[in-house]
C-alpha cells in the first residue's frame, strides 16, 4: 500500500499535471518486481523536461539534428542542448543486422536503442574525461577553460512502436535502459510504415495510436521514470487509413459518390485484372481510370453538394441548411458516419449515394483525406497521453504551423509542440528568403514549437564534408587535408585536432599511473607521442587557395 501511495503522489506532481492515465497506481505496482532499479536515463529525462518547459516559458526552442556517432555528439554538445537519434539514419547507416536500407522501420527493433546506448556511453565517457582534465587544472585554469555539458538529453525515434502493445512496451524498456531521455511514436501502421516524406503512408485509427501511447507511458511508470513522450501524427499528408473503427476518423474518410459504380468495388476490379493476366502499368491504368470515375469525397463534401443541388427550395433556405450542416459537421464535433447521415436526412438529403467501402485498396485500406485539420483532431486526441505533439508536414509552412498550433492549443493551451526541419524539404524552393529561413525556428518557437530538429542533419553534414574533402584530396593530396581539415580545426577550436587527447589517452594514462603509484613507463601520452607537435608555436603567413577564392592565414598558431 505504501508503494501504491508513493506512485499516486508521483502522478500528482507538477510533472504529470496534464497527463491522463486509464489505469491505476495499483496496476503499475502490480507489474513491478521486488528489486527496485534506477536508471541514468531518468535523470536525463528530468533534465529534458526542465529544458523544454523553460523554452516554452521563454517562447524559444531547443534546436538539434540527428547525430550519427560520438564525434558528432561531442561537437554538438558545445552548441546545442539536445541530441536527436534518427531511425532514418540508423536504417541507412547502422542497423544491428548491418543491412542498410531506406526508412521503412524494417530493421531489427533494437537498432535505434543500440545507437542511443552508443551515443549515451560516449556522452558519459567524455563527461568523465573532462572532469579528470579539469581536476588537474588550477582554479585559475579552470576559470579560463570553458566547461562543456556533454550530457545533453537524447530524444530517439520509436517509429510506430514496432508492433502490438507488448512490442511497444519492450521497445520502451530498451530505450530507458539504453539512455533515452525521450522518444517519439507515430500514428502510421507498423506493417506499412514509411518515412514521413514518402508516399503510401497508412494511418492507424486514433484509438489504436492512443493505445500505443498508453502502453509507452505504462512501461515508463512501471520503471519509475519520467521519459518524455512525443506523439507524432502523419495525418497532414497521409492518404490511407487502416480502419474506420474510430468515429473521430470518419470525417476524413473518402467515399465514392458516383452511383454508376454501385456494386463495383476497386478491389474486385483489381483482382479481376490480375486474374486476366494484367500487371504493372496495366493494373495502374485500371486503378487510375476507376478512381477518375469515382468522384471521391468526404461525407461532408457529398452532403454539401447534395444540398446545393436541391432545386425545390429557395436560396435563403439553402443557405440555412448549409449553415446548419456546417455547424453539425465542424471538425471539433468529430461527426460519425451514422450521425451525419441522420442529420443529412433531416435536411432533406435522402438516398445519398456515398460508399467508403468501394474505393478500399487491395490491402483493405480506406481512402483518407489528409490535412492540417486531420492532424489537429489527432493532436488533440493524443495530447492527454503525450508530453509533446509533432505534426509531420510536406513543406516548411508557417501558415500550417500556425493552424496546427492554434488548433491543438485551443483545447490544450499548455501543450508543447515539436517540428521536423526536414532536409527532405527543398528549402530553396519554399519561397522563403534567406532572412525568412534564418527566422523560421524562432518564429514558430513563439507558436509553441519548443523542440525543433533536422532529422538527418548528421548524415547530410557527414556526406558533404566527406565528398568535398575526398575530391580535393584526390587532386591535391596532403595540402587538401591541411587546408580543409587541420587548419580549419585549429581556426575553429575543434578539439579533434589533438585526436589522441580527444579520444581520452590522457584519461587512461591517469588509470595507469594511479594503478602503478603515479608513474607509468607505458603511458600513451608520454615522451614520443606525435601529438606533442601540436604544442609547438610557430607562425605562418600567406594566402591559401580553397576551391573558389582564397583565405589568408595570418599568424596561424599550432
Swiss-Prot record:
Mg(2+) binds at residue 157. Pathway: Carbohydrate metabolism; glyoxylate cycle; (S)-malate from isocitrate: step 1/2. It comes from Glycine max. Homotetramer. Substrate binds at residues 86-88, 196-197, 232, 420-424, 455. This is Isocitrate lyase 1. The keyword Hydrolase does not apply. SUPFAM superfamilies: Phosphoenolpyruvate/pyruvate domain. Involved in storage lipid mobilization during the growth of higher plant seedling. Its EC number is 4.1.3.1. GO terms for biological process: glyoxylate cycle; tricarboxylic acid cycle. The lineage of its organism: Eukaryota, Viridiplantae, Streptophyta, Embryophyta, Tracheophyta.
Amino acid at each position: 500500500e505504501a508503494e501504491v501511495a508513493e506512485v499516486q503522489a508521483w502522478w500528482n506532481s507538477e510533472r504529470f499535471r496534464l497527463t491522463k492515465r486509464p489505469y491505476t497506481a495499483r496496476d503499475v505496482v502490480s507489474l513491478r518486481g521486488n528489486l527496485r532499479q534506477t536508471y541514468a536515463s531518468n535523470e536525463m529525462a528530468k533534465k529534458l523536461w526542465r529544458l523544454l518547459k523553460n523554452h516554452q516559458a521563454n517562447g524559444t526552442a531547443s534546436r538539434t539534428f540527428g547525430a550519427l556517432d560520438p564525434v558528432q555528439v561531442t561537437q554538438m554538445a558545445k552548441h546545442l542542448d539536445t541530441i536527436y537519434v534518427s531511425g532514418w539514419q540508423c536504417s541507412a547507416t547502422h542497423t544491428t543486422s548491418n543491412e542498410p536500407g531506406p526508412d521503412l522501420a524494417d530493421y531489427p527493433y533494437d537498432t535505434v536503442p543500440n545507437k542511443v546506448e552508443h551515443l549515451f556511453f560516449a556522452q558519459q565517457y567524455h563527461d568523465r574525461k573532462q572532469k579528470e582534465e579539469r581536476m588537474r587544472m588550477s582554479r585559475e585554469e579552470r576559470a579560463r577553460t570553458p566547461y562543456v555539458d556533454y550530457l545533453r538529453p537524447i530524444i530517439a525515434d520509436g517509429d510506430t512502436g514496432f508492433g502490438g502493445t507488448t512490442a511497444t512496451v519492450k521497445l520502451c524498456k530498451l530505450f530507458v535502459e539504453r539512455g533515452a531521455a525521450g522518444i517519439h511514436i507515430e500514428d502510421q501502421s507498423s506493417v506499412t510504415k514509411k518515412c514521413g516524406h514518402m508516399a503510401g503512408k497508412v494511418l492507424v485509427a486514433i484509438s489504436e495510436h492512443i493505445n500505443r501511447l498508453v502502453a509507452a507511458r505504462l512501461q515508463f511508470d512501471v520503471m519509475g521514470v519520467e521519459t518524455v513522450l512525443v506523439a507524432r501524427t502523419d495525418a497532414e499528408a497521409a492518404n490511407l487509413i487502416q480502419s474506420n473503427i474510430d468515429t473521430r476518423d470518419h470525417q476524413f474518410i473518402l467515399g465514392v459518390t458516383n452511383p454508376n459504380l454501385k456494386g463495383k468495388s476497386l478491389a474486385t476490379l483489381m483482382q479481376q485484372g490480375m486474374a486476366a493476366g494484367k500487371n504493372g502499368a496495366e493494373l495502374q491504368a485500371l486503378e487510375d481510370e476507376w478512381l477518375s470515375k469515382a468522384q471521391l469525397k468526404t461525407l461532408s463534401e457529398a452532403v454539401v453538394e447534395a444540398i446545393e443541388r436541391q432545386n425545390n427550395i429557395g436560396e435563403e433556405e439553402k443557405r440555412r441548411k448549409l449553415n446548419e450542416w456546417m455547424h453539425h459537421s465542424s471538425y471539433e464535433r468529430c461527426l460519425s458516419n451514422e450521425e451525419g447521415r441522420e442529420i443529412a436526412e433531416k435536411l432533406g438529403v435522402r438516398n445519398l449515394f456515398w460508399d467508403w467501402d468501394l474505393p478500399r485498396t487491395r490491402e483493405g485500406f480506406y481512402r483518407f483525406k489528409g490535412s492540417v485539420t486531420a492532424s489537429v483532431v489527432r493532436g488533440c486526441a493524443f495530447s492527454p497521453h503525450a508530453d509533446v505533439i509533432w505534426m509531420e508536414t510536406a513543406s516548411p509552412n508557417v501558415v500550417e504551423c500556425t493552424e496546427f498550433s492554434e488548433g491543438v492549443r485551443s483545447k490544450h493551451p499548455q501543450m508543447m509542440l515539436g517540428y521536423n526541419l526536414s532536409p527532405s524539404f527543398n528549402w530553396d524552393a519554399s519561397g522563403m528568403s534567406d532572412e525568412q529561413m534564418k527566422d523560421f525556428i524562432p518564429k514558430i518557437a513563439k507558436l509553441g514549437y519548443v523542440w525543433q530538429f533536422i532529422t538527418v542533419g548528421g548524415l547530410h553534414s557527414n556526406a558533404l564534408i566527406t565528398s568535398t574533402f575526398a575530391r580535393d584530396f584526390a587532386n591535391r593530396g596532403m595540402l587538401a587535408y591541411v587546408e580543409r581539415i587541420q587548419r580549419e580545426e585549429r581556426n575553429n577550436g575543434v578539439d579533434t585536432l589533438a585526436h589522441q587527447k580527444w579520444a581520452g589517452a590522457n584519461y587512461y594514462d591517469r588509470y595507469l599511473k594511479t594503478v602503478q603509484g603515479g608513474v607509468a613507463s607505458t603511458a600513451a601520452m608520454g615522451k614520443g607521442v606525435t601529438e606533442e607537435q601540436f604544442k609547438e608555436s610557430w607562425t605562418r603567413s600567406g594566402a591559401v587557395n580553397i576551391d573558389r577564392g582564397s583565405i589568408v592565414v595570418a599568424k596561424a598558431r599550432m
